[in-house]
Amino acid sequence: MLKHKIIGLDVGSKTVGIAISDLMGWTAQGLDTLRIDEENNELGIEALVKIIKRDNVGTVVIGLPKNMNNSIGFRGEASLQYKEQLQEALPSLEIIMWDERLSTMAAERSLLEADVSRQKRKKVIDKMAAVFILQGYLDSLQ
């Protein structure tokens, strides 16, 4: 059993998908999608801090998009900057960067297989990608 819950984040330029673990550390569930504006540096950090405190979160796993050759591109750099901003807001929080290659594609594929409409997919894809990121991390702990 975990002392604190773990959340997973899929950070995009317009949204941050959020997933949360159970206290056993076995499963990840979609929690929320924050609207952000990366261009204007409105990253939703304050809203995320409230969620972290409200849900007794001790660890945050942020998806790190890497290129297939293992290099870090523009989106990866943006995720690393997001980590720095969150760490500034909560210095004692454990933040782990997790290779998220293909997590959004896997989420999209599973939603397509479930015959979810395009409009509904658009609403839940980031949260679902966060579930894939967090579940991958949780599975690595077992």
UniProtKB/Swiss-Prot annotation:
Keywords: Cytoplasm, Hydrolase, Nuclease, Ribosome biogenesis
Record's keyword annotation contains Nuclease: yes
GO terms for biological process, alphabetical: rRNA 5'-end processing
Signal peptide residues on this chain, from the entry's feature table: none
GO terms of molecular function: nuclease activity
Free-text function comment from the UniProt entry: Could be a nuclease involved in processing of the 5'-end of pre-16S rRNA.
Protein name as annotated: Putative pre-16S rRNA nuclease
Organism (species): Staphylococcus saprophyticus subsp. saprophyticus (strain ATCC 15305 / DSM 20229 / NCIMB 8711 / NCTC 7292 / S-41)
